């Protein structure tokens, strides 16, 4: 198992319960879609995995190591292997597409070299290769804010791939996109992650897209897992119960 979550709980300082208790395991190479209503705890769960949200209790084992116990250098090392794709892209808009993808390599560089943008030639070649795979090679030198929303999200995927991660977390990556752009983004994400053997966990509101692209689906409601199975096993009744 590349990821194992045991007794994960999150209570915010104001008393809001983000996660009641989650236990699950994820195999290497799987594409998992996490579905559920707004406020169910999907984003809290996803962001707990790389400690963007600090769990209240529980354990999260990434490739056998508990990231909840990691501090300082060890935490940075573990985060290098966990790529993140954000709902609102999180790109540096005034920088080029290529520079944004190269930022996926910053975790492997010294602070000085990273700050000066002194990337190794092999990093640049790798970034251009990834851009080609997401259909954006010809946009490499454009500013990120000159691209459409769907294209910007593909840059976000390319940046995550450039980290050479073993795990990618994608938090509502198509929430702001039209259906065609959404399908393109999920297609590129699934294809490249399959080719590279990267495990992917994606939060989605759109159940039909989740069923089309996921190997396995996890339904979260009120901070707990209420469904865990294949897309074929997810019935209309289960969806209705999940979103009631």
UniProtKB/Swiss-Prot annotation:
| Keyword Mitochondrion attached | no
Chief place where the protein resides: membrane
Provide the Gene Ontology terms for cellular component.
plasma membrane
Identify the Gene3D superfamilies for this entry. P-loop containing nucleotide triphosphate hydrolases
UniProt: ATP binding residues:
36-43
Q: Which SUPFAM superfamilies match?
A: P-loop containing nucleoside triphosphate hydrolases (SSF52540)
E.C. number: 7.3.2.2
The first-level EC class reads: translocase
Q: What is the superkingdom listed in this entry's lineage?
A: Bacteria
Instruction: Write down the chemical reaction(s) this protein catalyses.
Output: phosphonate(out) + ATP + H2O = phosphonate(in) + ADP + phosphate + H(+)
Q: Which residues form the ABC transporter domain?
A: 3-242
Pfam families to which the protein is assigned, alphabetical: ABC_tran
* InterPro entries for the chain: AAA+_ATPase, ABC_transporter-like_ATP-bd, ABC_transporter-like_CS, ABC_transpr_PhnC, MetN_ABC_transporter-like, P-loop_NTPase
Q: Which CDD domains match?
A: ABC_PhnC_transporter
GO MF, one term, reads:
ATP binding
Q: Where does this one sit in the cell?
A: Cell membrane
- What are the alphabetically sorted keywords of the record? ATP-binding, Cell membrane, Membrane, Nucleotide-binding, Phosphonate transport, Translocase, Transport
Q: How does it assemble?
A: The complex is composed of two ATP-binding proteins (PhnC), two transmembrane proteins (PhnE) and a solute-binding protein (PhnD).
Concerning NCBIfam families, the annotation shows: ABC_phnC
Role according to the record: Part of the ABC transporter complex PhnCDE involved in phosphonates import. Responsible for energy coupling to the transport system.
Give the UniProt family note.
Belongs to the ABC transporter superfamily. Phosphonates importer (TC 3.A.1.9.1) family.
Designated name of the protein: Phosphonates import ATP-binding protein PhnC 2
């Amino acid at each position: 198992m590349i990821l194992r979550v045991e007794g994960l709980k999150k209570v915010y300082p104001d008393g809001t319960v983000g996660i009641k208790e989650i236990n699950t395991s994820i195999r290497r190479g799987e594409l998992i879609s996490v579905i559920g209503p707004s406020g169910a705890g999907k984003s809290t769960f996803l962001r707990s995995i790389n400690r963007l949200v600090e769990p209240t209790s529980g354990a999260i084992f990434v490739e056998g190591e508990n990231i909840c116990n990691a501090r300082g250098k060890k935490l940075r090392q573990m985060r290098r292997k966990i790529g993140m794709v954000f709902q609102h892209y999180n790109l540096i808009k005034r920088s080029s597409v290529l520079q944004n993808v190269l930022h996926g390599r910053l975790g492997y560089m010294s602070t000085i070299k990273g700050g000066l943008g002194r990337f190794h030639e092999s990093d640049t070649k790798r970034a251009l290769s990834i851009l080609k795979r997401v259909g954006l090679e010809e946009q490499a030198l454009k500013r990120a804010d000159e691209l459409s929303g769907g294209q910007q999200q593909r840059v976000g995927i390319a940046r995550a791939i450039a980290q050479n991660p073993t795990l990618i977390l994608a938090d509502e990556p198509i929430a702001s996109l039209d259906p065609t752009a959404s399908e393109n983004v999920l297609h590129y994400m699934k294809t490249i992650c399959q080719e590279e053997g990267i495990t992917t966990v994606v939060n989605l509101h759109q159940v039909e897209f989740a069923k089309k692209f996921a190997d396995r689906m996890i339904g979260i409601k009120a901070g707990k897992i209420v469904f865990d199975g294949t897309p074929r096993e997810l019935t209309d009744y289960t969806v209705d119960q999940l979103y009631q």
